[in-house]
Amino acid sequence: FSNQMLASLAEAIQVSTSPKEKSKNKDIFYWAEGSLAFGKVRETDTSSKKKIYTDGITIGADKFTDDREIKGLAFRYSQNDVKVGIDGSRLDTDTYNLTYYSTTPVKDDKRFLDAVVGIGALYSDISSVLDGNKLTGNRNGKQIYGTLKLKEEIKKDELTLIPAAQIDLGYTLLSSYSESGKTAMRFDKQSIQSRNLRLSIASVETLNNKKYKMKRHGKIEYRANLHRSSNIKYSYISDSSTKYDTELNSGALHNINGEVGIDVIYDDNFSLFFIYELNEALGKGYTQKIHLAIGYLPQKNTNFAFKIEAD
């Protein structure tokens, strides 16, 4: 699997809450979002360049509580296509995720605790080209992941600054599979753990008029990738008596991530999202991504959006 698929199992992006009436606190608000993302990963000494394309759809429901807490449940289906190198190798994956999330005020409605926990399933078609020989296979996987994020909102007029600290934990179990083709190999089950510590500062500026609400936002983040290795056990189908065990090291300990974007919500409750993201793995390379999304909030009085991306 590519580094990009394992880099972030769940990320909660930009929470804003403003229920207009206390009587609406117990309502359930439904929403839907379709998204596209595409990007590139630079070639390094140990890995080939990659082109990434992802499209998906998410549906969810949010509930306000009497304590101004928000709880939600979302289901996401996405297709992830990764082209590796120039010889035709690729990884195509269908991903299904079910995610529970909440945001809870912990101090004067200025400090919040966000929590995310979810499960996922992966179904992958793998095609590798080595020395002109094409090898193919199918592999499945299961995921569990969670995030805790403590943030504070510092507001001045239409500008909000949001310093935050976050920890991500994830576990992925990949099934065994066998390739077909010349020099094919058989791979054993593989477990992958992820642990990330993040420190960030984000800014959100609100610009409204009679036709739409617009938010310009940006973020810079330091991410410590605390677990970057996994063991791959395999053998050649033509000689199953010899077993190989290779440690796969991916990513960098220190990472700097930045993003800028615009969110536009129209009076008819359709919304448009655009985000440009640059992730620099210090000493290893960088990844660029562009995210485009269209969302829909059915209720006219819904002022809450919680966007989730799980890869």
Regions found by a protein language model. Name each.
Residues F1-I28, P298-K307:
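Outer-membrane beta-barrel biogenesis signature
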Residues N25-D311:
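Membrane translocator/pore-forming domains, dominated by Gram-negative outer-membrane beta-barrels
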